[in-house]
Amino acid sequence: MLFRSKRATILDDEGAWFGFEQEYFFYKDGRPLGFPTEGYPAPQGPYYTGVGFKNVGSVARQIVEEHLDLCLAAGINHEGINAEVAKGQWEFQIFGKGSKTAADQMWMARYLMMRLTEKYGIDIEWHCKPLGDTDWNGSGMHSNFSTKYMREVGGKDYFEALMKQFEKNLQDHIAVYGPDNDKRLTGKHETAPWNKFSYGVADRGASIRVPHSFVNNGYKGYLEDRRPNSQGCPYQIASQILKTISEVPTSKKAAA
């Protein structure tokens, strides 16, 4: 009941679209899947979107594809999968229209992954920086978002005002973007420092990455907040994004 009552207070907007990119590690016997018993495998590089046994092993792809099928059968908008930067690290993407719908689907997708891996004797590590201060990437839940106004009206002035509001609300966002984010958002490994706000076109090292398509379309479309981490609550994340957006005046209404 407590969870349901909290969910009821979350800001929602059916015209707001969210795409969550959930990263995670497969773990076996307390180590990332594919790691040797001691030490580390070859450095990061070939694992990202990798293929072949030496890069992804023999079971991980079977699991992620089975998870995709389970999600689709459950009516979840599972949009894609890929091997991630670190060995044993993967990602799936969930899309939803409305913050509650998107968050509901992400929550269920996480649950299905954990239930699925039980039969393989594999654990899911959701921590955003399970390998600590090493040269291995952490895990995020990059949050792509847009409102009807952003998609249909937008404009450079509105975009710049929106970025100023995101900067002003930096601490409010970090507070709900997942625990231990200071360990992940260090300015290294494709992250921006947790205590500084930045944005840039196609910039993986920015707080908010701006797609080329957004700029080329007259500053209309979606944006990607790269700060939420893999442990973050999708309800709180989406709600805070909508709260910040709601604080920025709009010059005219989007089409009904």
Protein language model regions, located:
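Glycine-rich, acidic/polar active-site loops that bind/position phosphate-bearing ligands
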Residues: 1-256
